[in-house]
């Protein structure tokens, strides 16, 4: 078996001994999903800034490690932890939650979310300017990250805005020569070398003049049209929808995402929640079709609940 002590030493030099976990007890919160997914990892690394993340990736790629990128580890998709055993190489989990800066740009109409920034923090940051994130979803309350949502096209219950999607991101990939390569698709002038780009972004060392008025999408602009087509033979949402796969968007762990650029939305002046109950599922089908076909304004989100869920929520969730 290969001695990985030199690798661990190199990683500790980058992020500090405090943020390299190698014993089972400290690794468990990161190697076991809250919902599902569990397996062993050689180490868990917690970089604190973008350049540390880059240096950690370089070391891991050079040593041919399996890399699992992880943010909040909600366990909702099962992709942020090892899954069982039988891997052919050691696994390194890179947890990004310390890299949590959020930049408001374009008068708050867009944001830059770094690798570990959360929807909860984004909501707090946007509220004073009358804005809200794309994703107003349940997992916000358990620390779900902005980047994780984009990588998994999250937001299955979102009716009006659809899945999390952007064509503007900063990410690293392993190229055909087996080398780590940084790709800047944020459409922000941050420099040329990886180190320059990452340091400038981390420190928000750019001006409005550096932000390109991009024609690339920072949200899904076709979803309303798709979901209103109730006669379509194709579902409005399904896994691995090629329409939503664009580099960082839908990448699901195949690349390491450093930052994403996303649209924001005006907070509605008035919100209303409706609970509708029935003993006949056909009633819900008709309601759904009527709303999607005829309502001028679509609901922000919609969920189906079993009656037991409603009763439990009414009793325990206040």
Residue ranges and their predicted role:
Residues 7-11, 60, 287-293:
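Short amphipathic alpha-helices in soluble, non-transmembrane regions
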Residues 49, 74, 110, 116-122, ...:
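Short, structural beta-strand-to-alpha-helix junction motif
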Residues 120, 127-283:
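FAD-binding subdomain of flavoenzyme oxidoreductases
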Residues 257, 261-318:
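C-terminal substrate-recognition/cap domain of FAD-linked oxidoreductases
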């Amino acid at each position: 078996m290969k001695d990985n002590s030199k690798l661990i030493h190199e990683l500790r030099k980058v992020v500090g001994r405090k943020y390299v976990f190698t014993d089972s007890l400290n690794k468990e919160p990161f190697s076991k999903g809250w919902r599902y997914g569990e397996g062993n990892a050689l180490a868990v690394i917690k970089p604190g800034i973008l350049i540390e993340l880059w240096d950690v990736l370089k070391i891991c790629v050079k040593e041919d490690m399996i890399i699992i990128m992880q943010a909040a580890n909600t366990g909702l998709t099962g992709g942020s932890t090892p899954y069982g055993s039988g891997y052919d190489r050691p696994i390194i989990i890179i947890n990004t939650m310390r890299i949590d800066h959020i930049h408001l740009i374009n008068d708050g109409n867009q944001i830059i979310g770094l690798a570990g920034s959360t929807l909860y923090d984004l909501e707090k940051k946007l509220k004073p300017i009358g804005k809200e994130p794309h994703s107003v979803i349940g997992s916000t309350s358990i620390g779900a990250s902005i980047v994780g949502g984009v990588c998994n096209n999250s937001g299955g219950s979102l009716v009006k805005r659809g899945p999390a999607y952007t064509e503007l991101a900063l990410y690293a990939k392993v190229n055909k020569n087996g080398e780590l390569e940084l790709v800047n698709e944020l459409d922000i002038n941050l420099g040329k070398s990886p180190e320059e780009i990452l340091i400038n972004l981390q420190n928000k060392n750019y001006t409005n003049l550096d932000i390109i008025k991009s024609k690339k999408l920072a949200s899904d602009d076709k979803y309303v049209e798709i979901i209103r087509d109730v006669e379509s033979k194709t579902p409005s949402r399904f896994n691995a929808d090629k329409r939503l796969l664009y580099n960082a968007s839908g990448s699901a762990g195949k690349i390491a995402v450093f930052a994403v650029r996303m649209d924001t939305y005006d907070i509605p002046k008035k919100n209303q929640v409706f609970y509708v109950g029935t003993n006949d599922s056909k009633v819900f089908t008709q309601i759904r079709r009527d709303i999607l076909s005829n309502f001028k304004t679509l609901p922000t989100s919609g969920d189906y609940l079993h009656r037991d869920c409603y009763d439990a929520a009414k009793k325990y969730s206040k």
